[in-house]
């Protein structure tokens, strides 16, 4: 296409645009104009006024009015303030859990414990030492500790008749009057009085006495017999008896050796050197003859 053709096309489009603009700029005919006030057209103002009247008629039957809804929506932030404040207080308490908050909790716990202790029934009695065992209830000692300002310790007992019994008692000597004891009873027994009371309950039991060993003589030897002794472990009495037996055996051995040696010497000595029994040598003759005797020097005496 040439440039002239393009210009003609552009001019044609511009002319049609001008014609359309001229037509649009002209006034419309009255036949095309819509009437402003007609009875057949929709009027929204009248409809809205009718809805308002119906709303006013049904307003008493509504569960919530618009005013209450508005006030509730407005009051929500105000109601949420205490909740937020409570949250702040809780978080503040958590932050101070290792400080004043914890102290406050401990104080409340100690107060509750003190109130429980005050509610427990306590009975204090002053008795003498000989009346300590006159108590009809069975007790078992479970502790003892020193008391500040008193040279005497305090003993703690619990009821031994029943495991679930909460009865307790404390016994301590009165520092002002050492002849008396202060007994403090706490709580009551939840069972009947025991018919038989173990008198050794709460006290240290003495060791059972063992029967004394009996001594029996067999072939002139003392033998110790004890029912409770272990046969594998020798007792002190048995060891002493063994020592005595050894000494007796050694004595008899020496006597036998002396008798044998005496018989051997008597075979090589003259009759003047022998005693009447013939067991031990003895000098009964002349000493000069003994020295001149050749048998004396050649006998067994000098070899012995």
From Swiss-Prot:
Gene3D superfamilies: WRKY domain. Residues 128-194 bind DNA. This is Probable WRKY transcription factor 29. The gene is WRKY29. One of its GO terms (cellular component) is nucleus. Residues 78-88 have a biased composition (Basic and acidic residues). Coiled coil: none annotated. It comes from Arabidopsis thaliana (Mouse-ear cress). Induction: Induced 30 minutes after flagellin treatment. It is found in: Nucleus. Residues 196-213, 225-236 have a biased composition (Polar residues). One of its GO terms (biological process) is defense response. It comes from the Eukaryota. The lineage of its organism: Eukaryota, Viridiplantae, Streptophyta, Embryophyta, Tracheophyta. Transcription factor involved in the expression of defense genes in innate immune response of plants. Interacts specifically with the W box (5'-(T)TGAC[CT]-3'), a frequently occurring elicitor-responsive cis-acting element. Activates WRKY 22, SIRK and its own promoters. GO terms for molecular function: DNA-binding transcription factor activity; transcription cis-regulatory region binding.
């Amino acid at each position: 296409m040439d440039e002239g053709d393009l210009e003609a096309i552009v001019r044609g489009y511009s002319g049609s645009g001008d014609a359309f603009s001229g037509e649009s700029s002209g006034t419309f005919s009255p036949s095309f104009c819509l009437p402003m006030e007609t009875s057949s057209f929709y009027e929204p103002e009248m409809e809205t006024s009718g809805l308002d009247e119906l709303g006013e008629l049904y307003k008493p039957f509504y569960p919530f009015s618009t005013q209450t809804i508005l006030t509730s929506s407005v009051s929500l932030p105000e109601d949420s303030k205490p909740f937020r404040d409570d949250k702040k207080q809780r978080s503040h308490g958590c932050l101070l859990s290792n400080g004043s908050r914890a102290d406050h909790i401990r104080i409340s716990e100690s107060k509750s414990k003190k109130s429980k202790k005050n509610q427990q029934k306590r009975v204090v009695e002053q008795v003498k030492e000989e009346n300590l065992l006159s108590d009809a209830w069975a007790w078992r000692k479970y502790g003892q500790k020193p008391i500040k300002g008193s040279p005497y310790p305090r003993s703690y007992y619990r009821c031994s008749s029943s495991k679930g019994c909460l009865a307790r008692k404390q016994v301590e000597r009165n520092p002002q009057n050492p002849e008396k004891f202060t007994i403090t009873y706490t709580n009551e027994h939840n069972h009947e009085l025991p018919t038989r009371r173990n008198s050794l309950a709460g006290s240290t039991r003495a060791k059972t006495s063992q029967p004394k060993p009996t001594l029996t003589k067999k072939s002139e030897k003392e033998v110790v017999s004890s029912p409770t002794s272990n046969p594998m472990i020798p007792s002190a009495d048995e060891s002493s008896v063994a020592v005595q037996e050894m000494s007796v055996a050694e004595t008899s051995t020496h006597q036998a050796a002396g008798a044998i040696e005496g018989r051997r010497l008597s075979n090589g000595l003259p009759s003047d050197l022998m005693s009447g029994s013939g067991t031990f040598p003895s000098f009964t003759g002349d000493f000069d003859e003994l020295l001149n005797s050749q048998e004396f020097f050649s006998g067994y005496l000098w070899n012995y």
